[in-house]
Amino acid sequence: MTTAANRPGAVLVITSSAAFLATLDLFIVNIAFPAISADFRDADFGQMSWILNSYTVVFAAVLALAGRLADRYGHRRVFLIGLAIFTIASAACALAPSLWPLVAARTVQGIGAALVTPTSLSLLLNAWPAERRAKAVGTWASVGAVAAALGPPLGGLLVAAGWQWVFLVNVPIGIVTMVAAARVLRESDAAPIGTPDLLGAAFLVLGVGSLAYALVEVPERGWGATVVLVAMVVAAFGVIAVVIRSRRHEVPALDLAVLRVPEFAIATAMMLAFSCGFAGMLLVNVLYLTSTWGWSAQAAGLGLAAGPAVVVVVARLAHRIAVRLGVGPVATLGALSFTAGSLWWLWQLGSSENYFRGLLPGQLLTGLGVGLILPTLSSVVGSALPGPRWGSGSSLLNTARQVGSALGIALVVTAVGTHIANSPTELASIRSGWALLAAAGATSALIGVALTAVEYRKNRTHTRSSDQERAPSHDCKHESPIIRTGLT
């Protein structure tokens, strides 16, 4: 592959800009919820949640295919197509006259973002030499982490000019990035693979979408409602169907073979669990500030800016720490910090305003967690998988991230939806949301311990093998040990 290998810095800027846009729109809309709700008064809280989940669900499903599409048709081509779709859909979101046209435009926007995310990483991996690749990926992932965390404060500033600007801001950045990409990036050679499993991707949409639908309907209908139970059954069918097809199809929607690499499989599970808590955090805190404390969208956005500031600093250092300690210990520390921040809010926050001693310390702790986890887990694609699997591995890891985000948003709606609609000052529902965040963080930490154990065992095996290679041998048939990935 020839991806402007002589201009790796330019490739890093272009791919990071695209990843910034795709990730930003996962979270920037949270802060615009009150303003959009004011314009679309006929929609209830559960319906409004589809402005978020239509994006994340489709994002997750198309991500599963994006790497394979890029392998078949060329990474540069798919990257540019995805960026164009995303930019046009952003403009359509701003022009939407009512809720469901906005949801439709967000769905298309999610398709574009899904095409951009894994191709940007694979273009980056192939532009940088192996010895500098981990640092480049760390920078790329850090930009995504910063974008995710900057969503609320940036959204708050943009909402002052109208909620449409949370979408319009993407248009000039998207156009500039497209022009630069067309001039700098070089096309890769298309791989002779079969047609990707579009039906499998549809089953993934069906499974995740039905589960999210069931969860957001619970506040209004209850767990025993027929529509909720049917949606749960459909969700189970969709998930089982995509797994079966992925095992049998020549070019599956989900490349499950990469999960045979223990480090990658565990990192993927940790990404799913943590993303559930992270996406839930960004939504529940906006709801808390705007409903319980009665802050404006602008004040809420600025009030949540401390966490992103921590992410900016920590994400830049996370790679260096992970090189010395390993991905597992760093990610586990991040999960514990995120859990501590969520528990701090449960302990300290109530109906009265308590920013500096209540909200702020929790932001600092959760920001530390986000900055440590997202960059380090993203780097596992390049460190644990062989080169030919980078595209599909990146797609699967990001699919887990978006599925986790969709479930986190749906669970927050389940926890707080009824009370937000009927009693804005009700704290019990908000506290349930914080408890959900703490549970997601604790689950992530437990998974991180497993990742640490696998890394430790692998490092011991590698050290022992290196010692054997250096030892004198009189056997002419000596064969150097190989650290196997399970994908050879």
What are the roles of these predicted feature ranges?
Residues 20, 50-57, 84, 138-146, ...:
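Transmembrane alpha-helical cores of Major Facilitator Superfamily
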Residues 71-199, 387:
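Helix-loop-helix hairpins in multi-pass membrane proteins, especially solute transporters
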Residues 45-46, 130-140, 297-298, 387-396:
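Loop-to-transmembrane helix entry/capping segments in MFS-fold secondary transporters
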Residues 32-61, 104, 298-302:
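Extracellular/periplasmic helix-loop-helix junction of adjacent transmembrane segments
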Residues 9-31, 224-231, 238, 250-459:
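12-transmembrane solute porter fold
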Residues 35, 67-68, 72, 156-157, ...:
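Membrane-interface helix termini in secondary transporters
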